[in-house]
Amino acid sequence: MAEQLILKGTLEGHNGWVTSLATSMENPNMLLSSSRDKTLIIWNLTRDETSYGYPKRSLKGHSHIVSDCVISSDGAYALSASWDKTLRLWELATGTTTRRFVGHTNDVLSVSFSADNRQIVSGSRDRSIKLWNTLGDCKYTITEKGHSEWVSCVRFSPNPQNPVIVSSGWDKLVKVWELSSCKLQTDHIGHTGYINTVTISPDGSLCASGGKDGTTMLWDLNESKHLYSLNANDEIHALVFSPNRYWLCAATASSIIIFDLEKKSKVDELKPEFAAVGKKSREPECISLAWSADGQTLFAGYTDNIIRAWGVMSRA
């Protein structure tokens, strides 16, 4: 049965671009977002006809753009990365910062939790990758064979059988690091422009990367090789695998593309109706993506400060 995505509603509350989105399996009615307005918002999702949800709590503390956010697997904590050079660990029930992570010497662009929530990895414009414990202690800084430009994205593999960290950089490289030794395992070479994002499939077997060259490259993390590429035809800002379908979603400068990885074809392309923009201004772009845990809703954060929720439906 062919499927498509339909716009279900919007979430409005940020006063800056929505830079990152995170969902929780433990709390399906919660969405977390980060923004250039220096805050994170915890949303309560109601999915009503009139309103898709409302801001339950605003997380304040960062003194600059918040670039990335993730939720712990138990749904109790969130991590945020900021251009103020720090990370913060938040208790979601109270909205308080429980730890600040200080050590990067430039904007922090990305943060990720390990599968057991005991380790944290961050990537920065200082070109380093740092490993932390949840107490805020930096346990290791990866610089040897590291990125020669900004580290744009870092992600832990969810697969305990192959414990690796994947990173991407403005040096056009995807790097795979062995978690046990923090040593470089593989350099994945192929992109012709800076890379904005990497994402790992739910089973940890696949990694996808994308950026300036408009190509999504898929890598086999178990075999350490390039599998194939999918053309998005425009700069890629964000990538996310579906939790329950063999799909990869790409947020590009012009639309959101849903790829079927089995057929290597487009399932759908999402472009909301934007209010008319002047000749000089650009249409809003999607720069962040997250699936609901059940894979039925795709959340998309835009440069018009709005989060849009798309629902998977069967094509009539």
Curated annotation (Swiss-Prot):
The keyword Repeat applies. The keyword S-adenosyl-L-methionine does not apply. Pfam families: WD40 (PF00400). Keywords: Repeat, Virulence, WD repeat. Involved in regulating the cell wall integrity and MPS1 activation via its interaction with the MAPKKK MCK1. Disruption phenotype: Abolishes the pathogenicity. This is MST50-interacting protein 11. Belongs to the WD repeat G protein beta family. Ribosomal protein RACK1 subfamily. One of its GO terms (biological process) is negative regulation of translational frameshifting. PANTHER family: RECEPTOR FOR ACTIVATED PROTEIN KINASE C RACK1 (PTHR19868). GO terms for cellular component: cytosolic small ribosomal subunit. The gene is MIP11. WD repeats lie at residues 13-53, 61-100, 103-142, 146-187, 190-229, 231-269, 281-316.
